[in-house]
Regions:
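Short amphipathic alpha-helix that is part of the acyltransferase structural core
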Residues: 1-15, 38, 118
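Active-site rim helix/loop that mediates acceptor-substrate recognition in acyltransferases
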Residues: 12-40
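Glycine-rich acetyl-CoA-binding "A-motif" of GNAT/NAT acetyltransferases
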Residues: 39-45, 102, 115
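Conserved beta-strand in the GNAT
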Residues: 42-50, 57-62
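Conserved acetyl-CoA binding element of GNAT-fold acetyltransferases
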Residues: 54-65, 94, 122
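Conserved acetyl-CoA-binding loop-helix of GNAT-fold acetyltransferases
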Residues: 60-63, 69-82, 105-109
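Conserved beta-strand-loop-alpha-helix junction that forms the acyl-donor binding cleft
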Residues: 68, 94-103, 122-125
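Conserved GNAT acetyl-CoA-binding A-motif
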Residues: 77, 84-96
Length: 125
């Protein structure tokens, strides 16, 4: 999954997010992840998210270019959303790079909107 995500510049990965880190995330009970495969068994899409109390997050979503605009991303988001809703998540959030216009259009089409009056603060641990 990590190798698949790293193929796409628009998927935000920090240097510290390596395969070991991803394996640690995947075994957590609060993680939701799905893969989409083509008929040859190759990964063509992936989503990774998590649950934080009553909120959920999509950390990464990627779809191979030749499979975009075919509903793969939408189905991956719906699967992750269903997992979260089933365990009581009431709201989902995600981060999109300011320069990722296609990503902004995709997430808007999925019903997400930019919050007003909020700013994200982060720090490395």
């Amino acid at each position: 999954m990590e190798r698949f995500f790293r193929q796409f510049d628009e998927v935000s990965f920090c240097e510290w997010q390596d395969a070991k880190c991803l394996r640690g995330v995947l075994i957590q009970k609060t993680t939701t992840s799905y893969l989409a495969f083509d008929i040859a068994g190759e990964i063509v899409g992936a989503v990774l998210g998590g649950m934080l109390g009553s909120r959920g997050t999509i950390n990464h979503l990627a779809v191979s270019p030749r499979y975009r605009s075919q509903g793969v991303g939408q189905r991956l988001v719906e699967a992750a959303s269903s997992d979260m809703k089933r365990v009581g998540v009431l709201r989902m959030f995600l981060f999109v790079d300011d320069a990722n216009l296609a990503g902004k259009r995709f997430w808007t089409a999925q019903g997400f909107c930019e919050p007003h009056g909020e700013r994200t603060f982060e720090r490395d641990l």
